[in-house]
From Swiss-Prot:
Catalyzes the degradation of hydrogen peroxide (H(2)O(2)) generated by peroxisomal oxidases to water and oxygen, thereby protecting cells from the toxic effects of hydrogen peroxide. It comes from Soldanella alpina (Alpine snowbell). GO terms for molecular function: catalase activity; heme binding; metal ion binding. It is an enzyme of class 1 (oxidoreductase). This is Catalase. Belongs to the catalase family. GO terms for cellular component: cytosol; peroxisomal matrix; plasma membrane. CDD domains: catalase_clade_1 (cd08154). The active site is at H65, N138. The keyword Heme applies. Homotetramer. The keyword Signal does not apply. Its cofactor is heme.
Length: 492
C-alpha cells in the first residue's frame, strides 16, 4: 500500500466515523464510562482526541486584515507590455494565470461587521509558471505613513484602547496629529469611499511602488491599479448601519452568492510607469506611499483582467490559512526603495511564520503550482514528501544547477548610514486637490465626519488646532469650515 496515495483529503472520506489515525469509531454519541452513570475513563482515546482537536481549532488572528473573504479565478493579459517586463505571466495577450484573491477589512477583529469605516485589503496571489507573485494592496492608492518604522505605532493607535478594548477617535487623532503625511489617506477614509458597498464594487491598488524590468535589463517604476467593471459603490452612514445591522457578513455573502449565481466579479488591471531617471522631475517623491501619481501626466495603461469564477472550498483552509507576502515576486517584477514596501518585505513573511508555522508555504493555497526545488528541510508541520539523500549544495551526486539569471535593477547605490525623512514631503498639496474634486454635498459629508471625530471630548484643544491647521494648509475653505463649526482658531 502506498502511504502517500491517500493524503488527507475529504475525497477519501469513509462512510463511517474514524479517529484521526483511521481507526473505526462505533459510537460518536457517548463517552466511555464505568457503567451507565459512572465516571468517564481516560482511556477513551476518541473522546480525548476529539476534545483536544477542538481546543486547538483556532490559530492566531492576523494582527491586521483579520476579517476577510477569499475567492479563486484567473488573470488574463489583454494588452502587450512585454517591452516593459520579462515577467512570464505577462508575456503576451491571452495568457491566463490562476489566482486566489482575499478581500478584507484592516483594523477590526475576525468577526467584526463589514460595514465599519476602515480601509479594505485587496490581495492577489498569481500562481505563475515562475513561482507565486503576491500583489498585496488596499482599496485606496495611498497609505497613512511613508516609513515602516511607524507602522506598529500606527496600528496600535488605530486598534482598540488596550485598557478598555474600544476603538477611540482621540487616540487616532492624537497619533496622526504628529504625522501630517496621513492627510491624503484621510481624504479617502473620511470620504464616502470609506465604507464600500461590498468587495465587488471597490477598486484595488498595489499602493507601493514596484519596479518592472524587461529582457534588456531596463527598469521602470510601476504602480498597479484594479478597476471594477461593475463600478464603485459605497454606503453612507445610515445605509451602513442598516446593512450591518441586518448581516455583519454582508460583503462576504455578496461575494459568495454572486459567484455561485454565475455573476463573476471582474476587475481591469492598469499600471502607471515612471522612468527612474525622471523621478526628480515631480514635486513629490514617486517612492512616497502617501502620494498618488497624477493620471493627467502619468496615464493609466491597460494590462489585463481579473475574473473570480470559483468560490473557495473551505473557509479555514483557503482564507484563514491563506498567506500573502509582498516579498514574493517573479522575474521581471522587483521591489523599489519605497520605505514602507521595504519593511513589508520582512514583516509579512514573519507574521505568517508566527501564525501558520515555518512551513506555511507548503499549505495548498500558499504553495506554488509550478515545480520547485530547494534544501529548506524539516521544521514544524513539514508535510512535504521527500526522498532525496542529498540535502546540501553543491553536490556531485545531485548536480542541481543555479537557475538562469534574470535581470534586476542596475543602479549602484552610495550613501552614509542615516535615519532621516525624505526631502519632498509636500504633505498638503494632493489632499487639497482631492478635496476640491468633491461635489459640494460630498464635501459637506467629509466636513461633518471630521467635525464629529474632532468633537470627541478627549480630543484636546491643541490637537483640534493642529488638525484645523493641517486642513487649512490643504484647503483654506475646508480649514475655515472646521474652525467655524468647532469654534477653534487654526494654529499655523
Amino acid at each position: 500500500m502506498d502511504p502517500y496515495k491517500y493524503r488527507s483529503s475529504s475525497a477519501f472520506n469513509t462512510p463511517f466515523w474514524t479517529t484521526n489515525s483511521g481507526a473505526p469509531v462505533w459510537n460518536n454519541n457517548s463517552s466511555l464510562t464505568v457503567g451507565t452513570r459512572g465516571p468517564i475513563l481516560l482511556e477513551d482515546y476518541h473522546l480525548v482526541e476529539k476534545l483536544a482537536n477542538f481546543d486547538r481549532e483556532r490559530i492566531p488572528e492576523r494582527v491586521v486584515h483579520a476579517r476577510g473573504a477569499s475567492a479563486k479565478g484567473f488573470f488574463e493579459v489583454t494588452h502587450d507590455i512585454s517591452h516593459l517586463t520579462c515577467a512570464d505571466f505577462l508575456r503576451a495577450p491571452g495568457v491566463q494565470t490562476p489566482v486566489i484573491v482575499r478581500f478584507s477589512t484592516v483594523i477590526h477583529e475576525r468577526g467584526s461587521p463589514e460595514t465599519l469605516r476602515d480601509p479594505r485589503g485587496f490581495a492577489v496571489k498569481f500562481y505563475t509558471r515562475e513561482g507565486n507573485f503576491d500583489l498585496v494592496g488596499n482599496n485606496f492608492p495611498v497609505f497613512f505613513v511613508r516609513d515602516g518604522m511607524k507602522f506598529p505605532d500606527m496600528v496600535h493607535a488605530l486598534k482598540p484602547n488596550p485598557k478598555s478594548h474600544i476603538q477611540e477617535n482621540w487616540r487616532i487623532l492624537d497619533f496622526f496629529s504628529h504625522h501630517p503625511e496621513s492627510l491624503h489617506m484621510f481624504t479617502f477614509l473620511f470620504d464616502d469611499l470609506g465604507v464600500p458597498q461590498d468587495y465587488r464594487h471597490m477598486e484595488g491598488s498595489g499602493v507601493n511602488t514596484y519596479t518592472l524590468i524587461n529582457k534588456a535589463g531596463k527598469a521602470q517604476y510601476v504602480k498597479f491599479h484594479w478597476k471594477p467593471t461593475c463600478g464603485v459603490k459605497c454606503l453612507l452612514e445610515d445605509e451602513a448601519i442598516k446593512v450591518g445591522g441586518a448581516n455583519h457578513s454582508h460583503a462576504t455573502k455578496d461575494l459568495y452568492d454572486s459567484i455561485s449565481a454565475g455573476n463573476y466579479p471582474e476587475w481591469k488591471l492598469f499600471i502607471q510607469i515612471i522612468e527612474p531617471d525622471h523621478e526628480d522631475k515631480f514635486d513629490f517623491d514617486p517612492l512616497d506611499v502617501t502620494k498618488t501619481w497624477p493620471e493627467d501626466i502619468i496615464p493609466l495603461m491597460p494590462v489585463g483582467r481579473l475574473v473570480l469564477n470559483k468560490n473557495i472550498d473551505n473557509f479555514f483552509a483557503e482564507n484563514e490559512q491563506l498567506a500573502f507576502c509582498p516579498a514574493l515576486i517573479v522575474p521581471g517584477v522587483y521591489y523599489s526603495d519605497d520605505k514602507l514596501l521595504q519593511t513589508r518585505i520582512f514583516s509579512y513573511a514573519d507574521t505568517q511564520r508566527h501564525r501558520l508555522g515555518p512551513n506555511y508555504l507548503q499549505l495548498p493555497p500558499n504553495a506554488p503550482k509550478c515545480a520547485h526545488h530547494n534544501n529548506h528541510h524539516e521544521g514544524l508541520m513539514n508535510f512535504m514528501h521527500r526522498d532525496e539523500e542529498v540535502n546540501y549544495f553543491p553536490s556531485r551526486f545531485d548536480p542541481v544547477r543555479h537557475a538562469e539569471r534574470h535581470p534586476i535593477p542596475p543602479p549602484v547605490l552610495t550613501g552614509k548610514r542615516d535615519r532621516c525623512m525624505i526631502e519632498k514631503e509636500n504633505n498638503f498639496k494632493q489632499p487639497g486637490e482631492r478635496y476640491r474634486t468633491f461635489a459640494p454635498d460630498r464635501q459637506e459629508r467629509f466636513v461633518c465626519r471630521w467635525v464629529d471625530a474632532l468633537s470627541d471630548p478627549r480630543v484636546t484643544h491643541e490637537i483640534r488646532s493642529i488638525w484645523i491647521s493641517y486642513w487649512t494648509q490643504a484647503d483654506k475653505s475646508l480649514g475655515q469650515k472646521l474652525a467655524s463649526r468647532l469654534n477653534v482658531r487654526p494654529t499655523m
